[in-house]
Amino acid sequence: MEPTKKRIEVLDYLRGFALLGIIFANIVSIIHVTEHTGNVDIVYMKYLNILVEAKFFSIFSLLFGIGFYIFFHNAKQKDVNPYFLYLRRILILLLLGLIHQIFQPGEALFFYAIVGLPLLLFTFVDKRINLVLGLILLALGVLSGNKITFIPGLFILGYTIGQYDLHKTIYHHARALRISLLLSTIGFIISMVVLHLYYVAPSYDLVESTLSNETYVKMYETFSNLIVYTAPFISLFYVLLFVYLLKFDGAKKLLRPL
């Protein structure tokens, strides 16, 4: 298979994977679930928080940065003005984001447009500097405890992946991919252990009566922060595992769109 074709396939598969995860992440708010009473509800919410919340949002944000790189440089190769085309797209995204905010406040499209606009500035920056800036901004975003603040760092890191041509050459670095997957697996396992140890039920009514409300609030805040802190490690594991599995024809056939 040609590298360019494989690159497009990998990104398309990852986009579909990220969108599926985002649907799961938003399903509770979409169907307006306000109480979790049954055991099934509790287990579902537990693993929704541990395995899904903030993870697929992170993957999609990273893909936005990669997509920006591809769009920008394809436009330059076609000898058209990439800045004008991108600004037009961002304005459309901003409009859609504003409309989306009316029906589902707090969703990411509006923030994508706001953060995506200054992304043009990083097209003038060396890839090594972008890598450092992206990692710093992502770390600051994680420490803030709010997944929305992941966006700037992930956008820049996605663009940096494009600058390093990793979206084209990822399968040319088989050993590095295996080592990265191994390390990310360790990070994933540690994250799972930590999240299970600090897990708190989604409502005070569901915890032991011996636990005071004040203690519950503190424990829940800790668990909520840990969801955000561990999200980059879990997201990285998902991406690397998914990319690695796509090396095999059987996995590609299983995941291929209908």
Question: Where do the language-model regions lie?
Answer:
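Alpha-helical transmembrane segments and their immediate juxtamembrane cytosolic regions
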Residues: 1-258
